Amino acid sequence: MATTTRLTIEDFEKLPDEAVKHRELVDGELIDVSGNTGEHNELKDLIISLLRPLVRGNKLGRALTEQEYDFRGNVHGPDVSFFGLEKCELYNRKRRVQRFVPDLAAEIVSQNDTFESLMKKAQRYRDCGTAEVWIFSIETRQAYLMSDSRNVILDEDQEFRPETIPGFSIRLGELFDRI
């Protein structure tokens, strides 16, 4: 019976970029994740372009795309993430995997994602200390928000106001209309 060696985050970081592209580390194993479509990338880029000026201008912390984090030994790179000033001193630009979790993780539903797998990932984010998780569905033009105070599905006619980034607000339909 063959034994499988489980990878650590340190092992993951030593792998060449091409070996980990479109992969995450889950329970010691490399898991393939689907590549992004054009509209997926456009929504990700739009969200970060709206967040960054607010985050930087108000000195709230950092807003990043596809930054990988350590979720208790698992490596995930949310499409968009944010962490506040108190975590900025932990941020190491030269490190592939940050040794903390973001305050906010946003995922955009990809064509190969299942609801079950996304909810499992979102719950892992929350269980590891991420305060707020956003899941955007381009197909249904909805967003699902998870936090301590609410778990809610927003439709395109509703205002999107996250708790983790004060001052950010946009009608969800307007967000989808801009891609």
Which residues make up each language-model segment?
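Gly/Pro/Ser/Thr-rich low-complexity, intrinsically disordered segments predominantly at protein N-termini
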Residues: M1-I179
